[in-house]
Amino acid sequence: MVVEVDSMPAASSVKKPFGLRSKMGKWCCRCFPCYRESGKSNVGTSGDHDDSAMKTLRSKMGKWCHHCFPCCRGSGKSNVGASGDHDDSAMKTLRNKMGKWCCHCFPCCRGSGKSKVGAWGDYDDSAFMEPRYHVRGEDLDKLHRAAWWGKVPRKDLIVMLRDTDVNKKDKQKRTALHLASANGNSEVVKLLLDRRCQLNVLDNKKRTALIKAVQCQEDECALMLLEHGTDPNIPDEYGNTTLHYAIYNEDKLMAKALLLYGADIESKNKHGLTPLLLGVHEQKQQVVKFLIKKKANLNALDRYGRTALILAVCCGSASIVSLLLEQNIDVSSQDLSGQTAREYAVSSHHHVICQLLSDYKEKQMLKISSENSNPEQELKLTSEEESQRFKGSENSQPEKMSQELEINKDGDREVEEEMKKHESNNVGLLENLTNGVTAGNGDNGLIPQRKSRTPENQQFPDNESEEYHRICELLSDYKEKQMPKYSSENSNPEQDLKLTSEEESQRLKGSENGQPEKRSQEPEINKDGDRELENFMAIEEMKKHGSTHVGFPENLTNGATAGNGDDGLIPPRKSRTPESQQFPDTENEEYHSDEQNDTQKQFCEEQNTGILHDEILIHEEKQIEVVEKMNSELSLSCKKEKDVLHENSTLREEIAMLRLELDTMKHQSQLREKKYLEDIESVKKKNDNLLKALQLNELTMDDDTAVLVIDNGSGMCKAGFAGDDAPRAVFPSIVGRPRQQGMMGGMHQKESYVGKEAQSKRGILTLKYPMEHGIITNWDDMEKIWHHTFYNELRVAPEEHPILLTEAPLNPKANREKMTQIMFETFNTPAMYVAIQAVPSLYTSGRTTGIVMDSGDGVTHTVPIYEGNALPHATLRLDLAGRELPDYLMKILTERGYRFTTMAEREIVRDIKEKLCYVALDFEQEMATAASSSSLEKSYELPDGQVITIGNERFRCPEALFQPCFLGMESCGIHETTFNSIMKSDVDIRKDLYTNTVLSGGTTMYPGMAHRMQKEIAALAPSMMKIRIIAPPKRKYSVWVGGSILASLSTFQQMWISKQEYDESGPSIVHRKCF
């Protein structure tokens, strides 16, 4: 694949941003780095632009941004807001005129659009600006307005959802779910999800309701949408998914939830940014660390080919760079412009980041070198090399000595050949001899090659070459200085030669006495000396026959003497002959000739001996130097060996530390693996629970398996299907048995009768209520009532339907367990739930907070409820309800002369109570009115045709609810019990309870009950407290209606007790799942 890369354009080719450049005169290369070739900077010594057009522009722009205009920062405080853009309207106007900004010339304004500088561009944050909707009320219909504001009563919202399309869109293509999710109205979101609204609808910016909930940080709404299956990977028009917005908001919990529900951690937006790259670009260190732990791809590239490390360097975040380097990230990767992270750090002058990258690179090199080498093997090889080198130096010493002897022999042969060639010219002989020796010195520090039988490629030791070279240089220098003296006539060579011979003989004697052993040790050197003696004698013979070059022997002798000072040659000698001594020239010529010959011989012998002595000393010094050198090398080798041993021990310690770290890392990885396994197990359990909930949901949502709702009252039993507005079956909770066997012969007599059938035959049956004061006392009869409900009233099979039962508050735990056992073991229901009667009653009124005064046939309860949860510590129970009132009415009717004694007659009195009785607002005043007139009297016709008159008994009967002393009870009335429950509740919710007092149950159906409760509670409550009594018209069935609503909610499906859970945990499961 070939990738085209836009290189950075030259300054001359950059398009002038409209007419701004001509107005500004010449560009400032500091403020506008991309245009620095356009001319000389127009910045004066004061650091400001001199051009009048620039000053005019500056005055219009307000205050300069010192990042975008570094030369103009003296104008005032930067005008860059938190969004990274200029707030000044003039700046925005200028920005619109210039089109898209150059991120190099205007670094703070890079959010305006794509940069024209190619691969060096940057990204804008417009996708993340202003997350909430801009809503105008006139643009929304009734449903959308209710979803946005969320202040509509629940019952009105339910009615609204029934009448309208929940997926309807407004002008901005927003559904009610979009608006409710963006504004955090979780209750509206619940209702919309219960109505099966569409989840993945897109608004005008292609955003789902889940994206808006995450973008606006409404976590509760977002979690509900995820639980109902909203796709978290749908991108908006910017390519951002929900995970991008969670990372931008630094919401780690939401990001974790999104990943659990399948969000793609490697999804890219239109800029090529994954959530990790976005977190790095926005310098969100905590979420970057979180994504790294979640195994996000550290080598992902944006559209410019930049990795997370390069983005972190460009942003100047040293902490994120350090965090990424801990993950062994590749620091050498290049973006599309060919630049690495280090190059960006250097160009941006991020010195701390440069140091971090350098340290990381050094650590990597050390790590690679340590992996490729074995310190123990290197130590062994070093020791072996040292030992072999020492052996080689010891073996090479004898070879050097033997080479020295051969060199001396070759040098003598070379002198003889030179003498034969230059016999006609004495001066040329010495010159050629000296120059020949000097020219033979090589550049490599070895003994020079001579014209002899020795091979040309033969090399000699360094120390011999240095000594020989030094002697030759001294001879050459002395020859050049003394040549004028040789040609002078006043020289007397015989006298100097004689003095020199005497001194040499004396020194030779002393040297022979002091060094006898050395001469015996160097036989080869003596032979070489004899050859040199012959050479000198030949030179003297040539001197005798020459008249012009008489000074040659003197020069040779003096040259040898002068060389002693520095190189250990023949030392200077003192002649015993006076300097002024002279010899006759003509008379004693023969005598002088013989004497000269003797003196010459003696001189040659002494010179030979001196030369041998000097060479012996030179060899001894060389041997001493070799020994010292060997000793120093041995000491160095010992020191090196110690250093190597120390390094070896250090490496072993480091290896031990590395092994310890490796073991620690293995242990930590095992712990993490164990934790991951535990997390997997917990996730599996959650998945199992979700599968159970889904199964129950499918079970309850099927029309053939609708939920059965049964309200078990002390006097009446109400039963029906969830979702209905009223119960389908209402019958008395009584069981009748024949008083005598055989009384109903021939009529298919049964052992027991239930409900209305038992009530119709009450004359010959013994009637019993299986519930007393809200508590089941006869389980056999209660089981008969449930059997009659399923098979006779509703005509359904209980094993095919989930069942919701109600119970009175503060019911004993044993009764709840027995109820659960009968439902699962006797009727084999697939699922069940037990609800407290007061909670469904409050749901019927459209509230989740309030106090319910529930008075039925057997018991009265006052239950404070907050946010759908009953408060047990403030719940009160009063054993005074509708069943005691017929007995009291029978008693006060006896005062008028009407006697009702049998069970059948008691049912007649119950009917009188329900049809004629009412609650007086002022009992004393009503009694006075009844005594003074007959206006309150009513007539009632008995079954036998007799008509009776009822007077003050009409309001005296229900008055017992407010004054239990009429019945001989010492308890409080229903109004005082309600007030006491409110006072037992928390102070913070008492106001809500006073204004939301709900009446429920058949006993509260008396006319005037609500007004009397209002009056009595207002007298007890604080004077400034507002009291509101809510008396629904169908409150006789409000418990059942609330249970029908509760069982229809989708959120309720997870609360069922399944048959599998009952088999695993037994009847006690009801206490954990039913509160």
UniProtKB/Swiss-Prot annotation:
InterPro entries, per the entry? Actin, Actin/actin-like_CS, Actin_CS, Ankyrin_rpt, Ankyrin_rpt-contain_sf, ATPase_NBD, CC144C-like_CC_dom
**Molecular-function GO terms, alphabetical:** protein kinase binding; structural constituent of postsynaptic actin cytoskeleton
Query: What biological processes does GO assign it?
Result: axonogenesis; cell motility; substantia nigra development
User: Which UniProt keywords are given for this protein, alphabetically ordered?
Assistant: ANK repeat, Coiled coil, Repeat
Stretches forming ANK repeats: 172-201, 205-234, 238-267, 271-300, 304-333
Polar residues bias locations: 485-494
What SMART domains does the record tag this protein with?
ACTIN (SM00268), ANK (SM00248)
- Listed GO CC annotations: actin cytoskeleton; actin filament; axon; blood microparticle; cytoplasm; extracellular exosome; extracellular space; membrane
Record-linked Pfam families: Actin (PF00022), Ank_2 (PF12796), CCDC144C (PF14915)
Q: Where is this region: Disordered?
A: 369-530, 544-599
Q: Does the keyword Repeat apply?
A: yes
Q: Where is this region: Actin-like?
A: 702-1075
Q: Where is the composition biased (Basic and acidic residues)?
A: 377-392, 401-424, 466-483, 495-530
Where, if anywhere, are coiled coils annotated?
399-435, 642-698
**What are the disulphide bonds in this sequence?**
none
PANTHER family attached to this UniProt entry: ACTIN
- Family named by the database record: In the N-terminal section; belongs to the POTE family.
What is the name of this protein?
A: POTE ankyrin domain family member E
Species this chain originates from: Homo sapiens
